[in-house]
Structure formats: structure tokens, C-alpha cells
Amino acid sequence: MMHCLVGSEMCIRDRLHSLVGLAAMLVGYANFLSHATEYIGIEKTIHDIETYLGILIGALTFSGSVVAYLKLSGKWGGKPLLLPARHWLNLGLLILAIYFGFAFVTEAAIGGGVEPLIFMTIIALLFGIHMVAAIGGADMPVVVSMLNSYSGWAAAALGFMLSNDLLIVIGALVGSSGAILSYIMCRAMNRNFISVIAGGFGTGTSSSGPAIEVEGAVSYTHLRAHETVHH
């Protein structure tokens, strides 16, 4: 009961978009370090993949949610942070995450692979910050919807890791509904859905063609108030 009261008070005071990502990250680490159930063979590989994905998505969602909160509350400027070669930076972070994931999954020792997991967590946190920081304030509704989808997928990965069917179902529902809503919002705002997922679509491209000149004479017609009344 005390935990519920403390959690409710935190939800009222803190206006972060979601703490699901932080919960997924912490539970993933706790489950990995507890060694409550030791898997071998293909079961260990599958469980390690589930753990890795849960922590990866959770860390990305949490750091992105913090930046989104700062932007929406006015504590972070609404102007997008456009770093040079930011798309190559995102690609590099993705490649590093895949590399550390391979190193983590192929670790033969039970409980091994802590270093790749920590490095991946740092990369995911940085990627979440960079992804949301590169988005302008006008596009934040799409970002919030996408982060909501990410939190659902993080919960689903947690459900697979913990063999919890309820978490899997709820996470899949939240993730899929958030993704569909984000797609609809992108269509309405004339945004590219893939660009939203990848991050860094902060500014739209504007037309650079010549200005249109209006030619011809302009005529004016003056009307009196009583002339506009029809009997």
C-alpha cells in the first residue's frame, strides 16, 4: 500500500511522459543480475535477446521522454538541435548497439556480458536524447505518441523476459496502437513515418522556387451598408 501511495504522489508531482522505460531498464538489469533462473543453449540465447531488447527500448524511451518533458514544459527550447551529419550519427549508434548486442548474446558464461549491456544502455540513452532533441516543438505531439508506442514495446519485451503473458498482451496493445496513432498523425502533418522512427526530422523542407508574382489590374468595389440588405 505504501508503494502505491508513493507512486501516486510521484505521478502527480512529476509530469514526465512515461516512467515505463525506466522501469523496463531497471527490471531488465535486475532480472539479468539475479540469476534466479539459469538458461542454457538456445533458451539462454532467446532470453538474452529479450533482456537486451527490453533494456535497449526502455533506455531509449526514458531518455527521450525526459527531453520531451523538458521541451513541452519550456525548460528546453523548442528549436530543434540539428548536429552536423546527425543521420550518420544515428546510424553509427545503431551499428554500435547491434555490435554490443551480438557480443552480449554470444557471451558463453552465465551472467557474463555486463560490459556490452552497460555500453548499450549508454548508447540507447544518448540516442533517445539526440532523437527527440532534433525534433521541433511543433512536432512534439508525434514524438509523444511515438514514445508511448516505444514504452509498449519495452513492456512487451519485459513480458517475454519474465514469461508474463499479461505484460506481453498489454505491451503489444500499447505499442501497436501508439504506432498506428503516430502514423495517422504523420499523414495529417505531412510527415514521413520512417523519419519519425529514426528521429531528426525537426525541420520540414520548404520550397526554394521563385516567388509567384501577381500581374494585372486590381479593381475595388465600394458598397454601402443599406445596399447589402435585401428586402
Predicted regions and their residues:
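Cytoplasmic-side transmembrane-helix entry/capping segments in multi-pass membrane proteins
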Residues: 9, 13-20, 80-89, 142-147
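Membrane-interfacial segments at transmembrane helix termini in multi-pass membrane proteins
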Residues: 173-220
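Transmembrane alpha-helix boundary signature
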Residues: 8-9, 27-41, 108
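Single conserved hydrophobic/aromatic residue that forms the stacking wall/gate
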Residues: 1-7, 12, 222-225, 229-231
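C-terminal ends of transmembrane helices
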Residues: 8-9, 65-80, 127-137, 182
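Active-site loops and adjacent core secondary-structure elements that bind or stabilize anionic groups
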Residues: 10-11, 153, 167-168, 180
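Alpha-helical transmembrane segments
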Residues: 47-59, 171, 175
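Transmembrane alpha-helical segments of multi-pass membrane transport proteins and ion-pumping complexes
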Residues: 22, 59-70, 125-129, 153, ...
